[in-house]
């Protein structure tokens, strides 16, 4: 999760709480969403400092993206990972493609 505190963007890990178990697997509570946006990002993607356009979950389907928070911490978000961006004001974060590979992702706005 990317969030903003005292003017800086930081990472924070969050765990999903499983509230129901069925024969087909575990389920979390329902989270609010206002739609989905499909995105294809070229392998040359290198986007300098920017805030997120809205609070949203990003579900990485393939490829990877390196995210740098404004506090300097870097993380690589790989295939199958979900992250929540909430740094909608201020310097934001820096993001770039990993390994020159195209990436497909889904944005799930929550506002």
Positions of the model-derived regions?
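A short glycine-rich, His/Asp/Glu-containing loop-to-beta-strand
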Residues: 5-49, 103, 111
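Short, Lys/Arg- and Gly-enriched loop/turn segments at beta-strand edges
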Residues: 22, 91-97
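Short beta-strand segments in beta-sandwich/barrel cores
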Residues: 36, 46-47, 64-68, 82
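Short, conserved beta-strand element in jelly-roll/cupin
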Residues: 40-42, 50-67, 109
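Short histidine-centered beta-strand/loop micro-motifs
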Residues: 26-30, 46-52, 68-69, 75-76, ...
